[in-house]
Amino acid sequence: GENDMVSSIDKVLTTIASQDAVPYIIAEIPTNPRVEVPDLQNLKAVLSKQRQTPNGDTAIDPVFILDQTFCPNVHFLGEEDILATVRTISYASGSKFPSGGKCTAGYCVANNKAKALMPNIALHLSLCDNEATAQQYEILAAQLPSMLQRIKDAYVNTREFVTFIKETLPEAKLNFVSEDLVNEG
């Protein structure tokens, strides 16, 4: 797939189907302005595409695991959202926007297609003694109300930096979030 996330995922899922294996795809919402942001409709189509195993059975659909650490305010998993029809688990590290850098505990959620996986995640957290502490829950509860403002401020600062780079180095290849996409939410 070279540097094209969508075609790379398509190739990987086709290979996994040919092996009759269980596909887990982990992706991060990119924050580096030099990293490609995939077309979400094309990503959804590739993740939703039905594939066949070598014996003609329908291949197991992928579980898409999305790291939303840098955009925890964007809804991808609701019934009307872009990934509603793809088995998806989303997580965000609490060390960034959710806690304002005051703790490392984060959170994960699943859409309706992946909710059956959540008890396994809860069991894993329990067995590994990796659940947030009471203090981390308190920090998150105190910090979450101001999270959206921190995200807005970070976007404004980064947008100013990207604009500066584009003006100073017009030949630089930057893939920062477009104004149109920002206006969509």
Where in the sequence are the language-model features?
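Conserved PLP-enzyme active-site core in the AAT-like
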Residues: 1-166
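Short acidic amphipathic segments
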Residues: 165-176
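Conserved PLP-binding catalytic core of the aspartate aminotransferase-like
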Residues: 174-185
